[in-house]
């Protein structure tokens, strides 16, 4: 059995798990899967709220009761910047600020931090395959991927999974907009778990 690790997840509705039970949030599902591989997780600390932009997450972190260092830190943010029509050019400096904080929370060890792509809410009943939404999500994710590359941290792409939401209705929560617990499980099992297990070896 390995030593227990602590996990800090930073984000918005996609991290707090809007419209799903707490145990179905992807950070909680990841912790359970890690424990199945003999990696206990002592704490899952989530700083996230539905509707938060990068600026609001920054303020939320300042107000949060945190106990760093954390062994693992995730960052999934940006959909609400896109949804509110903020210029994608303003996203990079705000994302870099948050990523630098995430690295600091990981004892200044970037190898313990990962970025998760923004899911595409176009593929939900609420938006019905909107091309303009998908284009906006692609633009934001391109910035996020570049920042991850520049900082040498993993960029985990779950966007393609989210794009199955119209063909597989069970991947969308009852609100017709957010991912279901089943979709979050696919994020973990198909993409996140593999990367994180390599990170904590």
Predicted regions and their residues:
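Alpha-helical cap/lid subdomain in secreted, periplasmic
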Residues: 40, 59-201
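Serine-esterase "nucleophile elbow" of acetyl-processing enzymes
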Residues: 1-50, 60-68
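Residue-level detector of flexible, active-site-proximal loop/helix-junction positions
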Residues: 14, 51-53, 120, 162
């Amino acid at each position: 059995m390995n030593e227990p690790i602590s996990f800090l997840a930073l984000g918005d509705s996609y991290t707090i798990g809007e419209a799903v039970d707490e145990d179905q949030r992807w950070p909680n599902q990841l912790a359970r899967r890690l424990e199945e591989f003999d990696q206990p997780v002592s704490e899952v600390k989530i700083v996230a709220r539905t509707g938060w932009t990068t600026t609001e997450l920054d303020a939320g972190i300042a107000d949060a009761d945190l106990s760093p260092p954390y062994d693992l830190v995730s960052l999934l943010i940006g959909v609400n910047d896109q949804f509110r029509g903020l210029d994608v050019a303003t996203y990079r400096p705000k994302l870099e600020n948050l990523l630098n904080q995430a690295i600091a929370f990981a004892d200044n060890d970037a190898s313990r931090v990962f970025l998760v792509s923004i899911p595409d809410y176009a593929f939900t009943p609420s938006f019905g395959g909107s091309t303009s939404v998908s284009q906006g999500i692609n633009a934001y994710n391109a910035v996020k991927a570049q920042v991850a590359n520049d900082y040498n941290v993993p960029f985990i792409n779950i966007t393609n999974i989210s794009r199955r939401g119209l063909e597989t209705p069970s991947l969308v929560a009852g609100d017709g907009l957010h991912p279901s617990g089943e979709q979050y499980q696919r994020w973990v099992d198909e993409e996140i778990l593999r990367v994180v297990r390599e990170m904590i070896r």
